Amino acid sequence: MERSALQWVGAPCGSHGPYVFYRAFRFQRRGGGRARVLSLGDFFFVRCRAEEPACIAELQLLWEERTSRQLLSSAKLYFLPEDTPQGRTSDHGEDEVIAVSEKVTVKLEDLAKWAQSDFSKWKCGFRAEPVKPMDVGKNGQKEALMRYRQSTLNSGLNFKDILKEKADLGEDDEDSNLLILSYPQYCRYRSMLKRIQDKPSSILTDQFVLALGGIAVTSKNPQIFYCRDTFDHPTLIENESICDEFAPNLKGRPRKKKPCPQRRDSLNGIKDSNNNSESKAVAKVKCEAKSALPKPKSNNSNCKKGSSEDKSKIAVGEECRADEQAFLVALYKYMKERKTPIERIPYLGFKQINLWTMFQAAQKLGGYETITARRQWKHIYDELGGNPGSTSAATCTRRHYERLILPYERFIKGEEDKPLPPVKPRKQDNSSQEGEAKTKVSGTKRIKNENQKSKKEKDNAQKPQDASEVSSEQEKDQESADQKNFTEHPTAGETKQPNQGPPPLLPEAARPLPMEKIDVTENSSSSEKAKEEVPHLSSFPSLSMPPDEDTVLDATVTKRLHSSADTQEDTKPERRIHKAFTESLENEPPEMPFSTFPVQLPTQSDMEDDKLPEMADYIANCTVKVDQLGNEDIHNALKQTPKVLVVQNFDMFKEKELPGSMSDDSTFGYTPLLYSKGNPGIMSPLAKKKLLSQVSGAALSCSYPYGSPPPLISKKKLNSRDELSSSLSQGPHVPNSDPIAINRPSVIQHVQSFKSKEERKSINDVFKHDMLSKVDPQRCDFSQHCLSSLAESYVPKTDIQDCKDKMTEKRALQHSRVPTFLADFYSSPHLHNLFRHTEHHLNNEQTSKYLPRDMFRESENISTFTQHKHQEKLNLNYHPSLHQQEKKATVEASSDDQPTDLSLPKSIHKQTAKAPGPGLSHSSMAQQEGKGVSLFQAASSQAVSLDCNPKACRVSPMAMTAPKKHSELLHRSGKQQAQRLENLRKMEGMVHPIISRRMSPQNIGAARPLKRGLEELDKVISEKKVRAVSPLHLPKETSVKEKVPDAEGEGSKSLHGLHSGSVLESHKFPLSAPIFPGLYPGTLCTGLNNRLPPGYSHPLQYLKNQTVLSPLMQPLALHSLMVQRQFLTSPANSQQLYRHLATATPVGSSYGDLLHNSIYPLAAINPQAAFPPSQLSSVHPSTKL
């Protein structure tokens, strides 16, 4: 048949490679008869050869091959059973046909010839009753029938125009009257016909009939068959009309890469018009892309040459494979030498990444920087054949490239092996998580990058450069390495500097340090980092940091480094750090007098407090991380950016903490180290288990990281510590910002070991306390880390306070390694604070035994702000770094209008610091406490003693006020001191509670005992139920109460309790007491249990009740007004409440301040004075075990 007689009908319906597909074609009948249109899905009679029997063909595909200009078709042939080799059997139905197993590809002209035989003799098939055209014309049934036909018979293609063409041509009787069904369809059809046999034919067009298997045929003499079997036709292969060689190459699912090569060609102007075969084109594109890759080897030129010259696929493939092999060898070798070996190639889109393809595609698009700038990583992903539906394809591809290939790309380009680009935190809450994830993803690579960066920084630091230069360089390095987490840091550091005043440089130094630390922590496995960091740290102290701060920083950093080094089993870094610290100490100017420090620190703290409002929110969002970060650094960073810097390890946090906490009084809400990085307030079950096991272990023996039992504390040391605490109480105390130490062998362990013996030594040197050094340094280190961190986070400390706190801290640490981890282990930051508070309380209590409680109480009353800060510091004395961190976090959080961690009570110190003017002159807070500054100093000393007192007085969970016994002690300074000594002895007899004491309001808030009303408080005070509370600042309150035994006195006490009392309250739980008798059975609790009333509930009880611990749920998220209302419930307290409000809010009476003053005072309120037990019970259901 002439080509002119054949033509396509309708527009193409698709294309694939060289094929263009159509839905129908028209051919001219023989003899000049009417044209006929055959469309996809049509059944028609054909005769393959003149001598062969007629059969039915089903037209399944029509296409034109552009390269050869062939018009082709694919059809399935159906023969009657008798026309098959097996013949008809009894099993064959009368309407059955058998299909040829293979489709036949036939040129259109041949197919047209096949269809023009005489088929009048064909009599088989079921003669269905056609639907009358008049019936179909009613109610749009024709259109419905057409739609049915299109959707069912034509694979959803639109055949409207084709049908119109057919209608215009008109149909013969023999046209479109064949239909072959599947056997199930046929059965349904016959069944439906039986059901509607008495109905008119129009019912066949009913939608229900059609849905149930009815078939509406409009042709005049429809013949319906069914097919359920196939056979192999013996002679079709011999038919010259059948040309299977033209069959379209469509087997299998089209590869996802196929469209990519085309796009790449268009992008690179390599459009190949001669794509004879898709596979060939793809191969060419691949090779070209690979050749474009700037590879150290010159093989790609061969590959490129081959593709350009149309070499055979085999040759091209071999060359490409050779190039790929050479590339992979070079890549693996380089990455191994770089200490970031490629161990497992990840998957993208359910397909393992082909590093060679990825590298070539990236190079073709211009390399990493260009692709990132142009946001073309999705192109790389498509090149790799990823899942097209992936929404994170670009990010995942880029991160994999950064970790697996980017270092090598930079190497071959001669670029510097810079740290991997930081990951941008998605949200503030998840920033820490994401940062960790990022570091994990690129951990191996980053380790080396960071190590190199650390080395560079080390060199810079070692050079005699200005502090600013060193810090700036370090900042640059670390910013580049951790832009994601620390972009905010530089600003934070800068903001800090003005705020800090005397130690402005420290923040910068600290800032770089934290960055390094983050890297280190991220790659804590490498001891190199610790070594490298040591020089940096040493350089930092050499910066113009105040001597005190330097000392603290040195000690803390040393400890941190030590911890990391210990974990790495590399002591050299520790030695270096110690040396660096000692050198820095030696180089540093003599420590400033304590008198000077208190003034400066309060001012700084005040300034920070002012800043804090912003910080609080961020801290609240990322409680866990905040604690770890340098208090000031975090504080400033948070202020500047809601995004919280993500720090992988606590080591980093501690480093930051050291400089920040040393320089800043502001306290961050402490977050337990054990909390999962992702969820600041949530402790993972594993962590909790570890905590509990560690707690039990700690309680059992002095060797436990939590701290040696009080009996291990020598009375001499305790006495000296008491003296120290008293002397410290005389001036503000700035606990060393020591990292929190934790038994956990992971990051937490590093943190625990952070506190270096050197730091203790520096503290001892500073204070000339040999006693402290005598204590087991390691235990002390651990407890010191915890306590100092806690103290730091809880209360802003003045430099003097820092020194004093350091001494007390050392002693306390030496005496008892109260584990701050317990706080860390708390399920929620609130619990954590409680724990820290109690732990700190224990330590303070031990000292307080020696220090007159009157002094403590007085100091508390004198200046809640100073006292609290200092008290916190005192509490922190044992773990200054920990306390500083926590204190700063709490102070900052409280000073910030928004709490650092809502679950953590805001440190009253912060509140007080905020409210009062800068400096110890926070007399408004002090007045709030109801005592003069001198009292504050005394109080601080007392606080120290209280903190030091190992004996924790039992305070009913709600009693905010100190237990009667303790209050009496507090009331009577002489008695207090005696009782303190007694308590100390008891503490010695008891195992140090694993909970860390916390003086800060956070601790108070952490203390759950808020349930009892003020009257109950009085009763509690009178009763010995409150015994569990260590005589922290409560003594002050107690003394006040003693002075004012009436309800008003109680109210004032409760008010003070909000500040100081609350701190005590948080410390209420005896530090020495086991976490809870119920929680910890056996020897762990034995010593403590003796002293705890049966109903006593330990702060760690929260661990049992995680609903209370939920980080999302503040321990008691009561507005200050609520708290005040509670106070107002008792008339006597109302005055105190208002007085408290007046004093607490003077500096900033913003809602945030109120929240801080009262929510965190809730801790104070916790003092049970404010809240009736019923009210608090719902919030803290597990108050009692």
UniProtKB/Swiss-Prot annotation:
Gene3D superfamilies: 2.30.30.490, ARID DNA-binding domain (1.10.150.60)
Biased amino acid composition, Polar residues: 462-471
Predominant location: nucleus
Key word Chaperone present: no
Keyword Translocase (UniProt): no
Domain of life of the source: Eukaryota
Chain intervals with Basic and acidic residues compositional bias: 447-461, 473-487, 1034-1053
Residue numbers spanned by region Disordered: 248-281, 413-550, 713-742, 883-932, 1033-1058
Residue ranges of domain ARID in the record: 321-413
Protein localization: Nucleus
GO biological process, one term: positive regulation of DNA-binding transcription factor activity
Alphabetic keyword roster: Activator, DNA-binding, Nucleus, Transcription, Transcription regulation
GO molecular-function terms, A-Z: transcription cis-regulatory region binding; transcription coactivator activity
Biased composition (Basic residues): 252-261
SMART domains on file: ARID, BRIGHT
GO CC term, one of those recorded: nucleus
Record comment regarding domains: The ARID domain mediates the interaction with DNA.
Protein family per UniProt: Belongs to the ARID5B family.
PANTHER family tied to this protein: AT-RICH INTERACTIVE DOMAIN-CONTAINING PROTEIN 5B, RBP-RELATED
Known function: Transcription coactivator that binds to the 5'-AATA[CT]-3' core sequence and plays a key role in adipogenesis and liver development. Required for adipogenesis: regulates triglyceride metabolism in adipocytes by regulating expression of adipogenic genes.
Protein name as annotated: AT-rich interactive domain-containing protein 5B
UniProt organism field: Gallus gallus (Chicken)
